[in-house]
Structure formats: structure tokens, C-alpha cells
């Protein structure tokens, strides 16, 4: 190997020795409660397919029909020749779902955050962001060139202190996950929105793990907190979690959406989402309304699993964060212990990957369990029994 690649191998070896080397598990089946890996069936407790819509017969059928009608690809970016009727229909549906004037669809959630934040703020502007935000938000903030300040997790006092310097900047943007993907807790959206309005800032909330989950009908954080859309609020979300499809979106005012169509580089330099994915997302939104029992089943399963996990924690002294959602982590501490526990679970028929740095802070490794509406009581009990035996 040349020196360049020798250095890469050295770094890989260092990752391995620290317990930070990553490998891929290959799934040979659909993303259901039970999946096939390496020729054997295991229970899946790590998928974001919260409502089971990725496997819904109507979603699959609609996606196939759209592919047969329009083809596999859109063929270009939206601003060239890749703007299809399905893109506009999906944008109308998500705007209605989120209660906003308009919406814009991106090729992924990551690309949404990477494109939108630099489009809104730059060198003369201020960003204040929660410490535990998703990597895509962090990268979007860094890419923007704005003054980038981080406040301790959900620390409103420190956030207010940072916003006191708002008048030194042209624009200000508060950035937060609404549901934090590694801890499962919920951001204090009402208080954040009040601060945004007081200091004339935008509040951009990433609803990736809230859309389809929070609120009586799954519309997200605003419904959960009984809030109305505000000109200071930017709702970002994805179709790839509870909605079982793929892609990202921004929902907001018409002016905001038109501005992003003209300034967000990841919008006009990316091939647009394919017809089959668009049709699946449209159908998934329809099913969220048509089959409310899915959301009810999800929260019933979450309660069942959490109650069982608390007993595991009490017996085995496992520290459990205060999760408020279907994301339920067990903190395990160090890399090697986490890897061994994940491997032991897999041997016993439970697939839950080890979450390690840089996804979480050093010493904060965890097993991140996620519960789906389609898990059966028997499957949940089996998982809890195995946990009691190995923890």
C-alpha cells in the first residue's frame, strides 16, 4: 500500500482497538418486527419504521403502480425536468398535514438540513443550537458560515443568554431536534418558540422522529403541545421514519418555501425523489389519518416496553434516561461492554446495534431500542425476558 492508504489502515486499526470500528449487518427481508439476518430470524428493535408503514400493502401497491406509470427515476433535479405532479401533490399533502401554507420536498432528511440552514443564515448571522442535535443539523450549521453557538441540552437559561447578543447580527436561527434521536426526550418547543418570537429569530425544529408519532393524530410537536404554526417557526421533517418511505421536507410560509426553492443548493443540485417514493409518502400520510389504531398500538407497545425496561433497570442497576417516545435507550457506558451486550442480544435473537462515539459522547454508549406499532405483546415479552437474563 502507498503511504496514503497505509495511513488509512492505521486509523482503521486504531478505531478497532478502541471499540469504535463499525460493521454492517445485512438484512435479507422486509423491515418488519422480525427480520432475517445471515439466514436466521431475529426480532428487530432498532428500526425507525414506527407505524409499520414501510410494509403496509397499500403503500407498497401505490409505490409499484407509480413506478409502472412514471418510471423508476425522475430523471433530473426539480428545476430542470424532474418536477412531477407527484412532487407537488406530496408538498400539498405535507403542508395540510403540518398546518402550514406550503411545503418543499428534498431528497433526504440530511440533505434538507444541509441545504436549508446555509440558505437561511450566513456570515452576518447567528445560530444557537442544542448540544444533542442530530449530525445533519450540526453539519448544516457549520456549513452556513454563521456564528455558531451551542447551548447545553434543553438549557433555556443559557439559550436566553446567547440570544441577548441577537442585535449584533442580521438574522438569528434557533435549531433543535423536537425528539432527540439518541435519548428519546422531547424539546421544550413552547418555550423555544416564545424565545424565538421575543428575539425575532427563527425556530427550526427537526421533526424526523416526531412526525407521525407525537400529537393525537400524529401531526407532530405543534399538535403535541397544542400550538399553532408561527411565522417564526420552520418545521423540518422526514418521510423515512414513521411514514415508512424516504425523503425530507420543510413546511412553513409561502415566502419561506419560495425562498428555499431559489436558494437551497441541495434542492436544485440533487436529482429529485423518484415517483415510487413520492407515491408511497402520499399514501402513508393518508393511512396515518385513515388508520389511527396504528398510533394507538404504538403507544400501547411503548408503555408495555417501558414498564418492562424499568423493572430490568431496577434489578440490574441500568441507568435509563427519561425517554418520552418510542426511542428507549439503555445506557451501557463504555465501548467494549456495549459491543458485547449487543452481540449477546443478537445471539439470543434480538437485533439492537451498539451506539458509540461519535454518535454519542464518550462514556455514554448505549443500546438504543425502538418500538413499533407492529410488535406483538409476545415479541416484546421475549425481548424483555432476554434483557433480564443478560443485563
Regions of interest found by a model, annotated:
Residues 10, 16-72, 201:
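N-terminal "arm"/small-domain region of PLP-dependent enzymes with the aminotransferase-like
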Residues 57, 61-65, 69, 347-350, ...:
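PLP-dependent enzyme catalytic core of the Aspartate aminotransferase-like
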Residues 61, 65-108:
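Conserved N-terminal alpha-helix of the aminotransferase class I/II PLP-enzyme fold
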Residues 116-135:
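Conserved PLP-anchoring active-site segment centered on the Schiff-base-forming lysine
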Residues 149-205:
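Active-site phosphate-binding strand-loop segment of PLP-dependent enzymes
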Amino acid at each position: 500500500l502507498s503511504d496514503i492508504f497505509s495511513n488509512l489502515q492505521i486509523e482503521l486499526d486504531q478505531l478497532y482497538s478502541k471499540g469504535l470500528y463499525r460493521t454492517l449487518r445485512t438484512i435479507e427481508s422486509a423491515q418488519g418486527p422480525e427480520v432475517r439476518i445471515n439466514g436466521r430470524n431475529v426480532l428487530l428493535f432498532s428500526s425507525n419504521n414506527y407505524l409499520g408503514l414501510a410494509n403496509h400493502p397499500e403503500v407498497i401497491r401505490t409505490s409499484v403502480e407509480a413506478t409502472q406509470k412514471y418510471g423508476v427515476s425522475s430523471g433530473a433535479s426539480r428545476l430542470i425536468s424532474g418536477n412531477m405532479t407527484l412532487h407537488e401533490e406530496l408538498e400539498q399533502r405535507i403542508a395540510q398535514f403540518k398546518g402550514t401554507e406550503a411545503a418543499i420536498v428534498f431528497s433526504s432528511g440530511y440533505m434538507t438540513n444541509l441545504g436549508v440552514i446555509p440558505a437561511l443564515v450566513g456570515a452576518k448571522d447567528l445560530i444557537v443550537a442544542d448540544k444533542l442535535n442530530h449530525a445533519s443539523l450540526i453539519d448544516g450549521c457549520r456549513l452556513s458560515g454563521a456564528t455558531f453557538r451551542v447551548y447545553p441540552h434543553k438549557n433555556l437559561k443559557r439559550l436566553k443568554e446567547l440570544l441577548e447578543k441577537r442585535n449584533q447580527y442580521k438574522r438569528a436561527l434557533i435549531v433543535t431536534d423536537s425528539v432527540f434521536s439518541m435519548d428519546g426526550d422531547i424539546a421544550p418547543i413552547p418555550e423555544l418558540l416564545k424565545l424565538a418570537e421575543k428575539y425575532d429569530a427563527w425556530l427550526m425544529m427537526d421533526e424526523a422522529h416526531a412526525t407521525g408519532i407525537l400529537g393525537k393524530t400524529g401531526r407532530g410537536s405543534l399538535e403535541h403541545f397544542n400550538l399553532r404554526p408561527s411565522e417564526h417557526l420552520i418545521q423540518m421533517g422526514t418521510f423515512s421514519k414513521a411514514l415508512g418511505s424516504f425523503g425530507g421536507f420543510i413546511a412553513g410560509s409561502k415566502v419561506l418555501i419560495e425562498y428555499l426553492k431559489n436558494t437551497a443548493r441541495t434542492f436544485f443540485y440533487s436529482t429529485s425523489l423518484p415517483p415510487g417514493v413520492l407515491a408511497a409518502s402520499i399514501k402513508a400520510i393518508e393511512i396515518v389519518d385513515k388508520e389511527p389504531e396504528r398510533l394507538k398500538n404504538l403507544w400501547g407497545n411503548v408503555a408495555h416496553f417501558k414498564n418492562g425496561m424499568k423493572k430490568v433497570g431496577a434489578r440490574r442497576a441500568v441507568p435509563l434516561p427519561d425517554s418520552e417516545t418510542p426511542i428507549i435507550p439503555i445506557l451501557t457506558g463504555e465501548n467494549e461492554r456495549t459491543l458485547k451486550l449487543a452481540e449477546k442480544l443478537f445471539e439470543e435473537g434480538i437485533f439492537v446495534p451498539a451506539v458509540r462515539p461519535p454518535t454519542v459522547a464518550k462514556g455514554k454508549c448505549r443500546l438504543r431500542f425502538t418500538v413499533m406499532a407492529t410488535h406483538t405483546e409476545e415479541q416484546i415479552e421475549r425481548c424483555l425476558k432476554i434483557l433480564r437474563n443478560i443485563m
